[in-house]
């Protein structure tokens, strides 16, 4: 049997606070990111954020088709999207509260449907 000490309990509570705070920032960021993408004619189909206990965050952006993804890669839209996301995270205070350790991945829903039978959880696991 394991005994959880008060020190361990305190660490767990602090970690939970960080996780909730990190999610609060990300919930503010996502609509802004979507708005930016619409305004710049590079519509994001789906976005997933995977926070890592205040240490970093993975942001996975999906476009609808492989064709869109390839066009955006070739036309520098992917780099502009990364820059816009970082600007949004800075504007809302995320970077100041946590840090700028953000890992990006880009894919298409078409690929998720084809390779993962539409299961985004399996797709995200492959990153």
Q: How would you label these PLM feature ranges?
A:
Residues 38, 65, 108-110:
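General structural signal for secondary-structure boundaries
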Residues 62, 67-80, 114-127:
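Short, low-complexity, polybasic intrinsically disordered segments
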């Amino acid at each position: 049997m394991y005994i959880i000490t008060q020190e361990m309990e305190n660490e767990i509570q602090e970690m939970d606070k960080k996780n909730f705070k990190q999610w609060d920032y990300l919930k503010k960021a996502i609509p802004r990111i979507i708005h930016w993408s619409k305004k710049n004619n590079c519509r994001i189909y789906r976005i997933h954020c995977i926070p890592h206990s205040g240490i970093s965050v993975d942001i996975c952006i999906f476009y609808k088709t492989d064709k869109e993804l390839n066009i955006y890669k070739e036309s520098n839209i992917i780099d502009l999207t990364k820059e816009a996301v970082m600007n949004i995270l800075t504007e809302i205070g995320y970077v100041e509260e946590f840090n700028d350790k953000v890992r990006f991945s880009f894919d298409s829903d078409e690929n998720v449907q084809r390779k993962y039978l539409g299961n985004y959880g399996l797709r995200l696991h492959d990153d």
